Amino acid sequence: MNKISESDIAEFHEKGFLLVKNCFSELEINQAIKKTQEFEARLPNDWGRGNEMAYYETSQNNSERILMRIENYVDYHQIFHDFAYSEKILGTIEHLMGEHFVLFKDKINFKKSGGGGYRPHQDKTTKWSQYGTIFLNA
């Protein structure tokens, strides 16, 4: 695991973000890419109920349905479970913040040709304070 330094922690608190390079091996990254490509190859009716949540939109190029987002996949796919709950992710975040963290939401956004994209918005929902006071993206 890449240990973050005290200067990394100071940089995070100053800039609001920290880029940690080479956190995962080439093998780990390739496994995640392969699984993501498998998600991308699925058709809307290929997803089971009660597991992952896949969201499709109609392409602006033609009438094809294209995958725009998948959520709730970490607990159903070992490679993503291992990423999300790894010392590399949670351990680094906990070291950075000095407190215990949990996974709140897992999501992959797909930016495909013909996709509508996302209009400017803020990811702010009322009552988030019920769940925690700090939310980080990794």
Where are these regions (language model features)?
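Glycine- and acidic-residue-rich phosphate-binding/metal-coordinating active-site segment common to enzymes
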Residues: G132-N137
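Non-heme Fe(II)-dependent double-stranded beta-helix
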Residues: M1-E14, K21-Y131
